[in-house]
UniProtKB/Swiss-Prot annotation:
Protein name as annotated: Cytochrome c oxidase assembly factor 5
Function: Involved in an early step of the mitochondrial complex IV assembly process.
Domain (CHCH): residue spans on this chain: 28-66
Motif Cx9C motif: where in chain: 48-58
Keyword Iron recorded: no
Cx10C motif, short sequence motif: residues: 31-42
A matching Pfam family: Pet191_N
Family, per entry: Belongs to the PET191 family.
Amino acid sequence: MPKYYEEKEEDKHPCAGVKEDLKSCLLQTDCVLQEGKSPKECLKEGYCKALQVTFFECKRSILDTRARFRGRKGY
């Protein structure tokens, strides 16, 4: 489920909810907090893999002409 913040402006871009959740997931991992690695390095190591796949599918559905009629995947 996406996390909503009252004081934050709503992003109108496609896949913004998934992107925000992926970013917050990466910033809360032990890889970033304790080991001091960058979120990019932690993403390559496999942290938050489900959200990464969901974000990829959402971005791909923007370009896929068949999926454009069915709607974007993700939230």
